[in-house]
Amino acid sequence: MTNSRETHLLMKIINHSFIELPTPSNISAWWNFGSLLGACLMIQILTGLFLAMHYISDTMTAFSSVAHICRDVNYGWLIRNMHANGASMFFMCLYLHIGRGIYYGSYLYKETWNIGVVLLFAVMATAFVGYVLPWGQMSFWGATVITNLLSAIPYIGTSLVEWIWGGFSVDKATLTRFFAFHFILPFIILALVIVHLLFLHETGSNNPSGINPDSDKIPFHPYYTIKDILGLFMMAFTLVMLALFSPDMLGDPDNFSPANPLNTPPHIKPEWYFLFAYAILRSIPNKLGGVLALLASILILLIIPLLHTSTQRSLMFRPISQSLFWILTANLFILTWIGGQPVEQPYIIIGQTASILYFMIIILLMPLAGMIENHMLKPKW
């Protein structure tokens, strides 16, 4: 008798995607982050749905409605803390997932990689509009500063900003539309995730060695489902610990004050996961130049496949490129630290140096290292 998962139309898709999927036998724990991101997305959609049932997107009541959720709604405090810290977990997994892709050369699956970059933009947009919703001081001023950057676009800039605001400043219309965007974007992300997986399953997964794994594949279930469940438990444990013991550790104290357009906070800064990009934005004194550098810092991921010069796919056997990769990682930590510091010396010069190094490693040094390693591997006779 044929198993229903092999004949039923829907079950067949699930079977070929998650059960009998041929998977390289040597993929490491770094391949766990895809499933963890899926779990994060589900957590965010569910907690967000329950928050949306009680949240009011009006400038007069938004801040109070969040306080009401935390005080009066059954387990509202937990749902809110899980949602706020779930975003941090999402970005941690996202950056590790991208780092894995760069280290092991997964970017050579160009369609999967490009959809992934689009996903990154969508997640960043969702997080940004979501941060505005509690209508605290940092929410309001963050929205004002970041949306104002669009005014740097020549000719249409000012009109574009006022169109996004729905008026001449960040106000009720802005909050209402940001709530609408924040509600719809996760479902767009969900659709993009399916496309991402569709392209991935066309080629199959990459593996740490970077060589063709077709000769040695095993079914996804039970081997990798068990491995993914372990990762899921570890992530869930970290998230619950964060939400229960230090829920405000990654937030900004300014956001405990209701939004006040007449009082600017001394240091306007985004959440920690945007600080590296914010540091790159601030490192250029010109407004338009800063905006272009900000966009380039993410869009640069799209040209990484074009900059691959090595005959080997992975960095596993390439010590020079490995060193550069870890310098790039350290550089991103420095940029994150600088993004949270005031605009004064020595932070300005450190931020500018780190920004130049960021682009230099990706555009110049990594391709150069690949060429040098190719030359070193040539037989000497």
Swiss-Prot record:
Location relative to the cell: Mitochondrion inner membrane
Source taxon at top rank: Eukaryota
Binding site for a ubiquinone: H201
Membrane topology: Multi-pass membrane protein
Record's keyword annotation contains Membrane: yes
Keywords: Electron transport, Heme, Iron, Membrane, Metal-binding, Mitochondrion, Mitochondrion inner membrane, Respiratory chain, Transmembrane, Transmembrane helix, Transport, Ubiquinone
Function recorded in the entry: Component of the ubiquinol-cytochrome c reductase complex (complex III or cytochrome b-c1 complex) that is part of the mitochondrial respiratory chain. The b-c1 complex mediates electron transfer from ubiquinol to cytochrome c. Contributes to the generation of a proton gradient across the mitochondrial membrane that is then used for ATP synthesis.
Family listed: Belongs to the cytochrome b family.
Designated name of the protein: Cytochrome b
Binding-site list for heme b b566: H97, H196
Main location: mitochondrion
Additional facts recorded: Heme 1 (or BL or b562) is low-potential and absorbs at about 562 nm, and heme 2 (or BH or b566) is high-potential and absorbs at about 566 nm.
Example of a GO cellular component annotation carried by this entry: mitochondrial inner membrane
Record flagged with keyword DNA repair: no
Cross-referenced PANTHER family: CYTOCHROME B (PTHR19271:SF16)
GO BP, one annotated term: mitochondrial electron transport, ubiquinol to cytochrome c
Entry binding sites for heme b b562: H83, H182
Gene source species: Caenolestes fuliginosus (Shrew opossum)
Membrane-traversing stretches: 33-53, 77-98, 113-133, 178-198, 226-246, 288-308, 320-340, 347-367
Cofactor(s) required, per the database record: heme b
GO molecular function list: metal ion binding; ubiquinol-cytochrome-c reductase activity
Cofactor binding mode and count: Binds 2 heme b groups non-covalently.
Record note on quaternary structure: The cytochrome bc1 complex contains 11 subunits: 3 respiratory subunits (MT-CYB, CYC1 and UQCRFS1), 2 core proteins (UQCRC1 and UQCRC2) and 6 low-molecular weight proteins (UQCRH/QCR6, UQCRB/QCR7, UQCRQ/QCR8, UQCR10/QCR9, UQCR11/QCR10 and a cleavage product of UQCRFS1). This cytochrome bc1 complex then forms a dimer.
